Amino acid sequence: MDFTAYVENAKKKARLANIEEVRKDIDKSWVKEKIHNHVLAFDGIMTEEDIREGILNNIIIASKFCKDPGKQNISENLAGEVLGLTKLVSSGKRCVRFNDAGDIVSTSTGNTKSADFILKDYYATQKYTDGEGGAQDNQRNDVIDFLKRGSIKHKVAAIVDGPYWDKYRPILREEFASNPNVWITSVTELTEN
């Protein structure tokens, strides 16, 4: 399965659904707040009513005010669905993070990002990244931190897909080649094997 194509198709569908949602929710507080903040940011050169009408009648304007599918955990949800994995909690006492000693902890301060899934007997982080740049490099650093700290005492995995990871997955594998507690894979690889 080409997971990248699958995710991109799902994101496209989500964008269209999100445009319809922002139009449907035009009178709800979350949309009104976005409109109000936009008017303030542009020093009132347009009115709230101008923007409201634009959202309802212009797909380009609506697309600027709808929810961002990149922030809706689409790839994480699809990865879990495709692989038949249950999402682990991302906060609270049952959350799985690692501290500097490789111990499992639940607090976020000074510790790794939370594990997303259990894949076989590995605590796994899952990332889908489609571009280059600072934010993407931060995601890579989060994965490296998770693998380094988690592998001190546990088996850990990175399930990484998307164009960014097509480039960096081999580099990551090389970096952790001598660590038997680390498994680096992708949804595409897991579904093809």
Q: What are the roles of these predicted feature ranges?
A:
Residues 128-175:
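Catalytic cores of nucleic-acid endonucleases
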Residues 117-130:
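Conserved catalytic cores of phosphodiester-cleaving nucleases, focusing on short active-site segments
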Residues 1-74:
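Nuclease-adjacent, charged terminal/linker segments that flank catalytic cores
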Residues 89-119:
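Active-site metal-binding core of divalent-cation-utilizing nuclease and nuclease-like domains
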